[in-house]
Amino acid sequence: MFLVTLMKISILKSKLHRATITNTHLDYEGSCAIDSELLNAADISEYEMIHIYNLVNGERFTTYAIKAENGSGIITLNGAAAFKGNKNDKVIICTYADINKKDIKKHSPKLIYFKNDSNIIDTIKSSIPVQRNNVVSI
């Protein structure tokens, strides 16, 4: 009898792209509060590990998601995470899932994009465009 081990890889599950931090709350036990409407749109569960990438200061950190009021647009960094960003910073919030490598082609992440200077959903896509050679570096 042979045991077959399927290789699993971590792959992007969901992304809130260029969301705006609406507040920070140092005296809270931790986490990132996210409008529950946005959590649902991105298929992010309450208490799920999230990775946050701050586009203003370059900070990259992990915490967990908690629900904020539905339709509020709230994205609040709580506890120690409050040191990683400021109100109005643009961030990317991602989750990852471990899937069998053979299932990669069937997977489509939930990608939520925001308009500039607001928390209104602009578009929902299922693939990230191929990066071209004409990208301007900073």
PLM feature spans:
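Short, low-complexity N-terminal leaders and the immediately following helix N-cap/first helix
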Residues: 3-27, 136-138
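Compact, glycine-rich, soluble single-domain proteins
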Residues: 11, 21-22, 26-105, 116-117
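Helix-rich terminal scaffold detector
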Residues: 2-4, 105-138
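Aromatic-enriched hydrophobic runs in primary sequence
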Residues: 9, 64, 82, 96, ...
